Amino acid sequence: MASTTAPSRTNSRVNYSNEIHDLSTVQSVSAVPSVYYPEKSFADIFPPNLLKKVISEVVATFLLVFVTCGAASIYGEDMKRISQLGQSVVGGLIVTVMIYATGHISGAHMNPAVTLSFAFFRHFPWIQVPFYWAAQFTGAMCAAFVLRAVLYPIEVLGTTTPTGPHWHALVIEIVVTFNMMFVTCAVATDSRAVGELAGLAVGSAVCITSIFAGPVSGGSMNPARTLAPAVASNVYTGLWIYFLGPVVGTLSGAWVYTYIRFEEAPAAAGGAAPQKLSSFKLRRLQSQSMAADEFDNV
């Protein structure tokens, strides 16, 4: 007479992913898959080049605020030296120069609202946002107080204040910052754009929009650029506008471009996935690599 044996049933405690699970039944024919969550190392959270990026943002934001607020201060004191158009051109040029100078190091954000938008749409790691903000406000504050020393006795150091109703200035700041961020996303986050023209495109956007925004709101588009001279000059009129406006403008500009852009076709089996580029990482190396590959295939 053949005997039958029932499958063995055991109660055990098995550790999966550092968690204890009580298993009422373990079948020998089926294995319970273990789940592994790799822990991020210190180098993943704080990469070795983070300090260099922070210093780059301090320098870039310092020069941005020093030049733009310096030009605005001289314009406010003597309009014959620098015109309103001259201020706009200066602002656009310094943005262009700083993108080419520091874009390959830190991304040349120079703007807390831009950093926030890049992080929100996953073009920049959230863990580095506080460091960038600290660098940007530090550079801006240093520039404002240096201007206070070298331009004495000028008391108003290029502050941005609304010339009319506050809601007029708020709408203007949202629109001009939207334009700046829309262009920025087009040339800095889309791999099909020509990276070498990123600085010229963004600088031109800043120049064009500040020409008509200047007489209404000052054309700040940057909370750090507004806060620093406000503290150095002790002028805080409508300060909230220049925090809310740029944040809304950059987030909406980035969202609209992200929504309307065409998605790249997925890579074929075994092929390389499309490269995701963030901030103002210029693409000279990418184009040189493609040229080298074409040369090798000849």
Curated annotation (Swiss-Prot):
Parts of the chain that traverse the membrane: 54-74, 88-108, 127-147, 169-189, 197-217, 240-260
Superkingdom of origin organism: Eukaryota
Membrane topology: Multi-pass membrane protein
GO CC terms: plasma membrane
GTP-binding keyword on record: no
An example Gene Ontology molecular-function term: channel activity
SUPFAM superfamilies referenced in this protein's UniProt entry, alphabetically: Aquaporin-like (SSF81338)
Coiled-coil region list: none
Ranges spanned by the short sequence motif NPA 1, renumbered to the chain: 111-113
InterPro entries linked to this entry: Aquaporin-like, Aquaporin_transptr, MIP, MIP_CS
Tissue: Expressed at low levels in roots and leaves. Expressed in roots, leaf sheaths and leaf blades. In roots, it localizes in the plasma membrane of all cells of the young region and is more abundant on the distal side than the proximal side (at protein level). Expressed only in the xylem parenchyma cells adjacent to vessels in both leaf sheaths and leaf blades (at protein level). Is more abundant on the side facing the vessel (at protein level).
Membership in a protein family: Belongs to the MIP/aquaporin (TC 1.A.8) family. NIP (TC 1.A.8.12) subfamily.
Name assigned to this protein: Aquaporin NIP2-2
The organism's taxonomic lineage, starting at the top: Eukaryota, Viridiplantae, Streptophyta, Embryophyta, Tracheophyta
